[in-house]
């Protein structure tokens, strides 16, 4: 039922152990996740062997969050293309997939100009969010859960971050929220293209 779907999207990947814990969470719970990869962080190669089967099955989708997390509105056309291309190359070389068409601009920094430059290289869907775990910085489990309670609702794209370990202590409570609300999780591919979308290159 499309009406009861929420898309949980996880950005950055500063902390490799948090990415690893998210993979356990996905394997143990069946939750479907979209990672917006910031390619310069080692977590995306550190966790390759564990992540690849989940990417292959489509339970986890990988999308582009640039190489070094700059505000795209401060860059030239060449700078934007370089940031996206380096991350795209990582996704292709490490996982055999493309991140296109989904780009999430760091800090939400976008304009009609940045959108048009991204589209030139296949990144036609600038993906923002409606709701956040609030965990781009360090916060307490109680605050994070409060944000999860507030935003894990049908038809929402919710943003979290793989940067600090707080979220890893509340996975059980996140599952409880999803079950209480009869919510199904979906990747962006599930929502935009339907199950089984092939992003192999």
Question: Model regions: which residues?
Answer:
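Active-site beta->alpha N-cap acidic-glycine motif
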Residues: 1-71, 79, 83-93, 97-100, ...
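Structural detector of well-ordered beta-strand residues that form the stable sheet scaffold
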Residues: 34-36, 61-63, 104, 126-127, ...
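Active-site beta-loop-alpha junctions enriched in small/polar residues
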Residues: 13, 38-40, 67, 106-108, ...
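Non-membrane alpha-helical structural segments and their capping/turn regions in soluble enzymes
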Residues: 77-82, 142, 165-168
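A short acidic, amphipathic alpha-helical/loop segment
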Residues: 21-25, 49-50, 113-117, 170-174
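C-terminal domain-boundary segment and adjacent tail
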Residues: 1, 29, 42-43, 166-201
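His/Asp/Glu-enriched short active-site or ligand-binding loop at hydrolase and phosphoryl-transfer sites
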Residues: 109-151, 183-195
């Amino acid at each position: 039922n499309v009406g009861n779907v929420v898309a949980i999207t996880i950005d950055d990947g500063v902390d490799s152990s948090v990415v690893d814990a998210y993979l356990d969470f996905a394997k143990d719970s069946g939750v479907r996740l979209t990672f917006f990869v910031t390619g310069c962080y080692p977590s995306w190669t550190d966790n390759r062997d564990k992540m690849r089967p989940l990417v292959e099955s489509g339970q986890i989708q990988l999308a582009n969050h640039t190489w070094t997390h700059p505000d795209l509105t401060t860059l030239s056309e060449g700078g934007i293309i370089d940031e996206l291309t380096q991350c795209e190359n990582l996704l292709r070389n490490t996982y055999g997939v493309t991140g296109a068409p989904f780009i999430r601009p760091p800090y939400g920094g976008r304009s009609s100009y940045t959108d048009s430059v991204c589209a030139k290289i296949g990144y036609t869907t600038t993906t923002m969010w409606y709701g956040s775990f609030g965990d781009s910085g360090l916060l307490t489990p109680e605050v994070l859960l409060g944000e999860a309670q507030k935003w894990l609702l049908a038809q929402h794209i919710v943003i979290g971050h793989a940067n600090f370990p707080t979220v890893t202590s509340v996975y059980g409570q996140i599952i409880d929220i999803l079950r209480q609300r009869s919510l199904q999780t979906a990747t962006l591919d599930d929502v935009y293209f339907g199950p089984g979308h092939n992003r192999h290159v």
